Amino acid sequence: MNAPESDRTFSPKQALKPTPELYSEIVGDGMERLAAASLSCIGSFDDSEVIFHDVGCGLGAGTEAITSLKQDNIVIKGTDINDDVLEIYRQNIAKSQWPAEALKMDASNLEFPDETFTHCIGNAMLFVLPNDGVDAIKEMRRTLKQGGTAILNSWAHTPTIPAIHAAAKKTRPAGTPLPREGLDKWEDKEFLRDVIIKGGFEPEKVNFIQKDVHVTIGDLKRFATMIWSFIGGTSKAGWLESDEENWDIAVNAVVEALTQTEGYKKLEDGKNKIMFQAHVAVATK
């Protein structure tokens, strides 16, 4: 679920298990806000039929954002490779009565015929895929109708990864590989542009917009514990035995780093707000 780079099985006793439920609590309203910000870049839907593909649908953030914009004359196919995630997505379809169907598919090898969809969205997806998501983009383009629209995004700035790195540097020996090292390449919109062009879209048909995404989180200590649990052990080094004794120091370092990020705001009800920035690409076939 959290894409570890190491085969080590050790985990600190304090670490929360990386389940879809934990992921859902971590992202809170963040994925919905990212999807909504991304969809705002394509304008309103007209009255014609919309056939939307939510690629790597996860728990349904993209689907929720789509249905908030268009209720009628729309069909949504949500695809993901993870069975546990798809089960929750199906529950969300039933609960929210989305006009959607959940299907298990590899984003890099879709089973849909050519020119199936009018729109597709890959929400917070590319940077977790092999080959930087190029193969998935090729499949998205293949399955789009001529004139169809693909919406893709990546984080231009995230407050969470630097906070994780601060904790790792404070509690681990110098030279220990950092979790999610290399993600910073996605902060450059030219990298995202290059990936999309490698996926087959013509350069003049790819437009970019940068969006601020304000995410509400609960108790800061709880949030820091969750993201350190979810990401802290994902480097090539995995979890270290010393991480168990240094657990509180690491979590406190995450808390401190988060409060110092641009856009951080403490709310009155015990909640907090942190700010992400996203590159949103709108590509037309």
Region spans (language model):
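A short acidic, Gly/Pro-enriched loop at the edge of an enzyme's catalytic core
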Residues: 108-120
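Conserved catalytic/acceptor-binding region of the Class I
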Residues: 134, 141, 146-219
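Conserved alpha-helix/loop element of class I SAM-dependent methyltransferases that forms part
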Residues: 28-50, 64-68
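Core SAM-dependent methyltransferase catalytic element
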Residues: 199-201, 274-285
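Class I SAM-dependent methyltransferase SAM/SAH-binding core
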Residues: 50-110, 135
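C-terminal helical/coil "lid" or tail adjacent to the Rossmann-like core of SAM-dependent
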Residues: 4-13, 18-22, 205-268
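A short SAM/SAH-binding and catalytic strip from SAM-dependent methyltransferases
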Residues: 118-132
